[in-house]
């Protein structure tokens, strides 16, 4: 299981999600196989890999949900860069995992909802072609669990060269590197 968490942490690092990468690396050493949550994780009925059920992101999402719902406010330093040392982070995570065992078990039963606006860059670029060459608009339909924000691609501004999309977009500016 540890390799799945490490691999997902590597993916997060590669995409600039350093806080999530650090969280996942700490979780590698926090999940106790004897707890109810640990039993659920280590006996996952599907494929826990990042490319499949992505159990690491499910657990990371569950922890973030606990913070956002104010059920585990003590997690806040984890989401502020440099606010907590690794050893303290691990101790904090172990306490939160134990205290919110049942809630986290329920949370990981569902796939993570990532909705990364960065992924809209490809859709924005693709939508430009039919409009530019045929005067047609691209119509997007729900693509799956993570399609929500991507369906609003026409509200984003793509900052690539001269850019594409409304420049005064309050939604997002998608930077392409």
Each PLM stretch: what is its role?
Residues 49-54, 65-66, 70-96, 114, ...:
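Class I S-adenosyl-L-methionine-dependent methyltransferase module
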Residues 111-120:
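Conserved SAM-binding loop and adjacent beta-strand
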């Amino acid at each position: 299981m540890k390799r799945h968490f490490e691999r997902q942490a590597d993916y997060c690092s590669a995409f600039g999600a350093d806080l999530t990468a650090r969280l996942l690396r700490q979780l590698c050493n926090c999940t106790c196989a004897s707890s109810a949550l640990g039993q659920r994780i280590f006996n996952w009925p599907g494929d826990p890999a990042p490319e499949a059920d992505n159990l690491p992101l499910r657990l990371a999402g569950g922890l973030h949900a606990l913070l956002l719902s104010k059920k585990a406010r003590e997690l806040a330093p984890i989401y502020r860069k440099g606010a907590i040392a690794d050893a303290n982070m691990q101790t904090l995570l172990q306490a939160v995992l134990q205290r919110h065992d049942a809630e986290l078990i329920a949370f990981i039963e569902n796939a993570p909802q990532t909705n990364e606006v960065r992924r809209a860059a490809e859709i924005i670029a693709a939508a430009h072609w039919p409009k530019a060459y045929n005067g047609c608009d691209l119509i997007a339909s729900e693509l799956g669990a993570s399609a929500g924000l991507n369906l609003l691609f026409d509200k984003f501004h793509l900052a690539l060269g001269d850019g594409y999309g409304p420049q005064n977009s309050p939604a997002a500016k998608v930077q392409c590197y």
